UniProtKB/Swiss-Prot annotation:
The keyword Signal applies. It is found in: Secreted. The lineage of its organism: Eukaryota, Metazoa, Ecdysozoa, Arthropoda, Myriapoda. Residues 1-24 form the signal peptide. This is U-scoloptoxin(16)-Er10a. Contains 4 disulfide bonds.
Length: 108
């Protein structure tokens, strides 16, 4: 019975972990604008609603604007806490979010 309970606890944890991995770390920063475009973190001009990527730090960027100004939304991989039975593996792709690390757990 104890091993079944342990399995259920670990299985539930893994489901919660997968749900957590689907969310990104998202931040919004007010940015400078020129000619109706955002000045991105990469010092390039980006039109509102334009999406671009920084493959060096596995992030996705979007330029948005409203009545208060221009903003750059940056999505990056989240930090993942995991139990000893699990380990982190590299992402499977070159671009966000596929480049984010994932956690895998061994079930006994």
């Amino acid at each position: 019975m104890a091993s079944f309970t342990s399995f259920c606890v670990l299985f539930t944890f893994c489901l919660l972990l997968l749900a957590h991995q689907a969310r990104s770390g998202e931040r919004q920063y007010k940015t400078e604008s020129r000619n109706g475009k955002c000045v991105g973190e990469d010092d390039q001009l980006h039109a509102p609603t334009e999406v671009w990527y920084n493959d060096n730090d596995c992030s996705e960027h979007t330029c948005v604007n409203d009545d208060t100004g221009y903003y750059e939304i940056i999505r990056r991989c989240t930090l993942i806490a995991y139990p000893d039975e699990c380990h982190m593996i590299n992402g499977t792709g070159p671009r966000y979010p596929q480049c984010c690390c994932k956690v895998t757990c061994e079930l006994d």
